Amino acid sequence: TTLTINGKPTDKVVTRTGFRQTEFANGMVKLNGRVIQFKGYAQRTSNEWPAIGLSVPAWLSDYSNGQMLASNANLVRWMHTAPWKQDVDSLDRIGLMQAMPAGDSEADVTGRRWEQRKEVMRDAIIYFRTSPSIVMYEAGNRGVSAEHMAEVKAIRDRYDPHGGRAAGSREMLSKALQDVAAGLIYVLAGAGFS
């Protein structure tokens, strides 16, 4: 990707993209034409290591995220805020899907807090929209109002209209409000786990 000003290149960066086809319809999720069931982890966005902390090399992110893949997970639902670029790139490399939140609290919010959440969602979508591993944008850790869900979907539709990504919120099962329920909790409960 090249940034040009007045026809002259001023900055350049390698932009990697990947391709996949998704469909969220009729109560099913399809990836590349095949029905799948999300199964995986709700991971802290910091994804830190004991005694090392957050600043880990890329290979350690690949190793850590690879452990989830090796345990038969196919999705990571990051907690509360968008992950750092290194983890997004890692999941792109190893082929693990992710649900990306923008920023939330344990409930729907109003006023300036909601406006901030929308701003963070917009910025995260713009920054990560070329990452094929992101299959879902999460509006909140808990359900949000119908109006708020519509606003998040409008942000997605404006800044990532062809990305094939769902928009949803954890603990919000109304099909009329969202594309997919983001909570892995329901998969686990349906399998007899609590």
Protein language model regions, located:
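Secreted/periplasmic carbohydrate-active enzymes, especially glycoside hydrolases
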Residues: 1-94, 120-121, 135-136, 152, ...
